[in-house]
Amino acid sequence: MKRTLLLTAIVAFAGLNTAQADDFGLWGDLAVQKNITKSFSVDAGIDLRAENELKDFTRIGAGVGLGFKATKWLSFGAGYTFLHDYNLSETKPSYKKDGKTFRGYNVDDAYWRNKHRAAFDVSGAIPVGRFTITVRERYQYTHYVATNTQRTKYRSEITDLAGWTGKVYTICDRHFSSMEQEKDAKGAKDKHYLRSRFGLEYNIRHCAWTPYATYEFSNDLSHQLHLDKQRLTVGAEWKITKQHRFDLAYVYSNGADDDNNSDCHALSIGYKFKF
């Protein structure tokens, strides 16, 4: 079993290319859960994210959910989340219609955007000795609300700077004679994803801490299940009492689904109150 776990972890890390991550973040969430019956439960929570090397808050979210435990090993869930996301400033090269001839850069200012998200889950848990294997399949729909930002266009590259006497605009170590600013409309759009997650946790005898690891990947349902994002999480849950739970984890995300583009290492801190 230990050899299998080690091999699984190595494969997951290799596939994620963690060395390519270019950001560090701090994620936090607070949640409450109420058991209505032995089978039904409701929950609510808020989450905050600070990224861009902890320089910017990039997410404020709030959600509610409903859970149904069909058997000891099978459960279902549904939820809604409102997201207020911050999109960092982005610089992209611009090309002519042939797709090859470089003409300059487009720089989009940072902006906030609202999203509405609905999710439906099917989860399974199978105990194997002191280990528990978990599987979750989630359909996730996200609606992006239309908004506006400002775009700056740099055009007409200067190839002979020494002999140039006009205005100079510099970006990405290249020089241009023209700079224009315009409103950039970010239209409303919808995204559909299938988010699959596999996990393993270990029950340490006479210990309040339960270590776990999960591997999750997101497939775009609108583009032939294209793999857009992978996420690896390694952490532990502390069962303080029957009602209070504390969670601490390291998260690595690679790629972008309907969240912001992010190749990011993050420290995740969570607290849940169950009653």
Residue map of PLM features:
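Start-of-domain marker
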Residues: 21-69, 73-86
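Residues on the lipid-exposed face of transmembrane beta-strands in outer-membrane beta-barrel proteins
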Residues: 30-34, 64-68, 120-124, 139, ...
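Predominantly the C-terminal beta-signal and adjacent terminal strand-loop region
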Residues: 213, 227-275
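Outer-membrane beta-barrel translocator domains and adjoining extracellular loop/strand segments
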Residues: 23, 55-60, 88-95, 146-153, ...
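Transmembrane beta-strands of outer-membrane beta-barrel pores
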Residues: 46-52, 80-86, 126-128, 139-145, ...
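Residues that define the transmembrane beta-barrel architecture of outer-membrane proteins
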Residues: 24-26, 58-60, 114-118, 187-194, ...
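Repeated loop/turn-to-beta-strand initiation elements of outer-membrane beta-barrel proteins
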Residues: 39-44, 73-78, 129-133, 206-211, ...
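Outer-membrane beta-barrel domain signature
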Residues: 18-20, 50-55, 107-113, 183-189, ...
